[in-house]
Amino acid sequence: MARSVGWRRSALITVSGCVILNWWGNLMVFVDLLFPVQGGPVPLDHAYLLFSALSRHLPALHERSDMGVFSLRGVSNTRELLYLGRGTMRLRCPIEAVATLLPLVSAPLEIAGRRLSLGAPSLHALEPVPSLFARLVTFKHAMDEAAFVAAASRALEALGVQATLKVGRRRIVRITGKKVVGFALELHGLSAEHSLRVQEQGMGGRRHMGCGLFLPPGRAARVQSHGKAA
């Protein structure tokens, strides 16, 4: 029997190999799965810990370079802890990979000694909006803004995407004990095709750890307002 995933402005998807159309009537290639999360709190800088916890349940995730793992959404009153409350975890994946992620529902996850559990996910179609925002994008050796802009421009050219760049806040995260430097990034003036391409392919490295993943600015702002990042 096919298992169903909830929907928002998109056709109901059944994990049974059927053709899925988004709310523009086009074939959906990538989607976002939003899992409700209970438990915590977790460290504010938790991207590597989250990916490690997910990989313990889904070892094949290491090999899926086409999947993105966003940082958890929650509320932070300090610069150290994220309180999840009615938080969510967002995974971006090809439509054909949805079924492989459903075993995460109710799977016990442990992050920094705190137990988390995931509820049944809802499915969200990617939106071809003209502006996109990423909280953190990283490129090798792009330690300052000038080097970052050059690397981001090369990445867009490689994707065949035309856009205006606006670089935001410089951020530092820790991955396997090492400091990684990146910047927030806005893209403007995107065509519908290019907008979807950026969301599907991402930019830069470490997309399993919340980097290089884009959302429409309004949605990204709502996420950030619930989880103030260091």
From Swiss-Prot:
Keyword tags: Antiviral defense, Endonuclease, Hydrolase, Nuclease, RNA-binding
Up-regulation conditions: Part of an operon going from at least MXAN_7266 to MXAN_7259 that includes a CRISPR operon with transcription continuing into the pre-crRNA locus.
A Pfam entry, by short name: Cas6
EC number(s) stated in the UniProt entry for this protein: 3.1.-.-
A Gene Ontology molecular function term of the record: endonuclease activity
Record GO biological process: defense response to virus
Keyword 4Fe-4S: no
Disulfide bond entries: none
InterPro entries (alphabetical): CRISPR-assoc_prot_Cas6/Cmx6
Function: CRISPR (clustered regularly interspaced short palindromic repeat) is an adaptive immune system that provides protection against mobile genetic elements (viruses, transposable elements and conjugative plasmids). CRISPR clusters contain sequences complementary to antecedent mobile elements and target invading nucleic acids. CRISPR clusters are transcribed and processed into CRISPR RNA (crRNA). Processes pre-crRNA into individual crRNA units.
Family label: Belongs to the CRISPR-associated protein Cas6/Cse3/CasE family. Subtype Myxan subfamily.
Name of this chain's protein: CRISPR-associated endonuclease Cas6
Organism: Myxococcus xanthus (strain DK1622)
